[in-house]
Amino acid sequence: MTLNKKTNNENSSKTTPKLSKETDLRNDFASKNYVFNPQDKVFQIAQVFGITSAVLIKKLLQLGLKADVNQTLEKDIVELLAKDYNIQVSEPQEKHTPPQLQPQTPSLTKTKPNQKLNLQKKSPIVTIMGHVDHGKTTLLDAIRKTRVVDQEFGGITQHIGAYQVEYQGNKITFIDTPGHEAFDKMRARGAKITDICILVVAVDDCVKPQTLEALKHAQKAQIPIIVALNKIDKPNNNTQQIMQELSSYDLLPEEWGGTTPYIAISALKREGLEKILEIILLVSEIQNLQANPDQKAQGTVIEASLDKSLGLVATFIVSDGNLKVGDIVVAGASYGKIRSMEDENKKKLTKALPSQPVRVAGLKEVPQAGDIFYAVANEKQARQIVAEKKSQTKENLAKTLSPLNLEDILQDLETEKPQELNIILKADTQGSLEALQGMIAKIKVSDLKVQLLRAAVGTITETDIAFAKSSDSLLIGFNIKPASSTLKSAQRQEVKITIHNVIYRIIEDIEQKLKSMIKPTFEEVVTGKVEVRKIFNISKVGNIAGCYVTQGIVNNSDFAKVMRNDEVLFKGKIASLKHLKDNIKSAKQGYECGILLDGFNDFEINDIIETSKLSKVEE
């Protein structure tokens, strides 16, 4: 599009430069095409979309991006926004003059256009993906020459970890995304921040659904994929089958004329690792990865948790700029001043450069894994940004979060409704919490419901116990250790606390609890038949039918149905079962017995009595 270049007050959000006639015609005729111009600012793009600048800024905030009316946007961000208005974004036919950004305007581009001279080569960020147990963490540990796998519970990496290694003088940052489908959100977020994806497939197995999920995440983000064919030391080798199947998903091997590198490795025996690292460096060289280490930092939150000594800590990966101790940062819906910073080896740092993973302390609230973080000018600006974000998401959060008002919950519990299992969930990190919430939401046992009343990061507190007691809830903790005083308090108040380090155990516990809540269903099962051959009248007792058991077994606890000429005369309980004068528990086929019924005396010879019992139907 052609924009009016005569805009004298671009610094003022109140003055909106007028678009050219060509742009006006695009709006008048609801044009579906917009030629991307890196000079276009937020207010200009908003006019093309036919919306106000405020609406566009709100949409950016919902994406976790802070902008003002005079800010430029990256093409991929514009394309994402344009989809909502059915507008196609195309490349310009000729190069545009680099725009002059206003001073102190935070940019959403990876590098500010007026700082291109400061661009420097940056290390690649590599995500290791694949199916559970195919060897992702083993590969990462082999590269780091450490052992972490044995410390993990259940054979699954519980959280995303980020680490930096050095090979031939070049640094490479690795992200290990958990392989189980429960961590789908975390894996998807991991794919968004990475430069290269290593897709691990075990050759003694096959391509799994999780393999394809990981593949699709990477392809959707247009990330180069390197396939690591792991466990080549195993006797069963399905390499050709795996290559053929992955080829159908546009991962044609180089040796077959494609562009996807397939590397045979044994992570356990550390075979093929150098080849993997060489290919990573080669791919990153082709990508020409660059960043500006002089500007304010921005990047992605990898994980967040509570530390006993530091309080709330978060793992950041810096994608651009320079993050320093003392910086004010916004991370999702949280903000704070960086008090301390350390690398994966707990070495204290004063700054972090592009592609570097660091653990920081100083945020006021727990951010979510995958949130964008960026440094801002001061705390006042950070507060304003976060306040606006929270205002925008308040309605959505209200729909997704369970009620926390105790009076409302108690009133809800008193009303008639389908049986529910109330749960209060506490976890060590935000990533674990999200994974558990997702899996709990999928639990289905009969028509019973799981009501997640509260879900939060941190250990179990006295408040949680009081809340669980009042709402009759099951209190579940994942990978946390409550204080002994808290456990004693729960015991005194008869509040059950379940603590696990393996997610599946929690899910199994919930399912078992739900099954125990199911109201049993019974069916009538015929136990025996008898023929009335004599009638005995006992004073003060009534008539006793002298019977011969023709079929099955008659029990003294059975129900009885008296039939005459195929007509049912009575249904009721056996009051007494006798043999001669003795009370007996049962009488088998071919034996005689006396039956006294509760509420029926009008027996006749040749009546048939059918006995039955109620049997619980297994779900």
Curated annotation (Swiss-Prot):
GTP binds at residues 130-137, 176-180, 230-233. Residues 121-289 form the tr-type G domain. Coiled coil: none annotated. Keywords: Cytoplasm, GTP-binding, Initiation factor, Nucleotide-binding, Protein biosynthesis. GO terms for molecular function: GTP binding; GTPase activity; translation initiation factor activity. Residues 230-233 are annotated as: G4. It is found in: Cytoplasm. Residues 266-268 are annotated as: G5. Disulfide bonds: none annotated. Pfam families: EF-G_D2, GTP_EFTU, IF-2, IF2_N. Residues 130-137 are annotated as: G1. Residues 1-18, 98-111 have a biased composition (Low complexity). InterPro entries: EF-G-like_DII, IF2_II, IF2_N, P-loop_NTPase, Small_GTP-bd, T_Tr_GTP-bd_dom, TF_IF2_bacterial-like, TIF_IF2. One of the essential components for the initiation of protein synthesis. Protects formylmethionyl-tRNA from spontaneous hydrolysis and promotes its binding to the 30S ribosomal subunits. Also involved in the hydrolysis of GTP during the formation of the 70S ribosomal complex. Belongs to the TRAFAC class translation factor GTPase superfamily. Classic translation factor GTPase family. IF-2 subfamily. This is Translation initiation factor IF-2. It comes from Onion yellows phytoplasma (strain OY-M).
